[in-house]
Amino acid sequence: MSLKRRLLLIARLAGRNAAPIALAIALFGMGPAPALAQDDAMTPIRTPAQPEAIPLGTPPLPDAKVPESWHSQYGSVFARNVTEATLTPFLPDPAKATGAAVIVAPGGGFRSLSMENEGWDVARALADRGVAAFVLKYRLNQTPADLEGFGRSIREMLAGPRPPRQPDAAEAAASLAPQLEDARAAFALVRSRADEWNVDPDRIGMIGFSAGAMLTMVTTLAGEDARPAFIADIYGPLSPVKVPADAPPLFVALAADDGLFAGSGFGLIESWRAAGRPVEFHFYERGGHGFGMYPKDTTSTGWFEAYVSWLRMHGLLQAKAG
């Protein structure tokens, strides 16, 4: 699927009443925190050293010619034009390891990845709680190499019409086929090295942010052999879905002032409840879109501790007996 169609798909998932500026913020990977406003300019940076990153072996997107590049913004770092998917392990101290694992999918509208705020920082915090975490750097649609052209291309996409209807699950999976392939490869890799990484192959979950939440949901509903044991949707779309009888426990966090996804109802939550599957939903008064691990003066900052408490409630912070 073309970049334009992908962005329009995301726009449609956001709902007809989503403000264009909110959509632009989401597609750039985050909502600007007031304390970080001085860092809102995109600045090119060298590609960070990633010695622990493991190539997943999935092929580059067709006609992908622009090389991977990185930039800083809002005090975080972002990757663009990713053509080689990787998985980076963040393993806990063996003495603290619970056997649970989480694959972390950053957001960024499928044309950038918020690698720090929604990736590495999340993984480090999970590892500190005894959970093995793996940051998925999935393949992205190509955008112009220069940041000015990148920004211009997004503005042009946002000016286009929106799709006439919400895509069904099969269409969503087809539109994200390369990213879904990366997610499936990530689950396969973790399971293949479960003994080495002290991971219980039956306790591997996934957490996604914004676009990464979309990928998490598609992986859950159409990922075949991925089979996440538990999932978290952090400020992703809450459109209703067809929930399978064996759907995993779901954790959701969203801010009421999220201009992208807070105005379209809570269909996802209702779908999980109607199917009789476990779901926990935190709806914060303020936080905007893209709060991630940023320190903010809003209660949305508490989402991670709430998530950890949820993991504990499901027995995932204790090693499995026997």
Positions of predicted regions on the chain:
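Short amphipathic alpha-helix adjacent to the substrate-entry channel of hydrolases
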Residues: 117-134
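Short beta-strand/loop motif that positions the catalytic acidic residue
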Residues: 252-254
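C-terminal catalytic histidine-bearing segment of alpha/beta-hydrolase fold enzymes
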Residues: 278-322
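Short beta-strand element of the alpha/beta-hydrolase
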Residues: 99-107
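Primarily recognizes the serine-hydrolase "nucleophile elbow" in alpha/beta-hydrolase
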Residues: 178-246
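N-terminal cap/lid segment of alpha/beta-hydrolase-fold proteins
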Residues: 40-94
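Conserved alpha/beta-hydrolase "acid-adjacent" motif
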Residues: 259-264
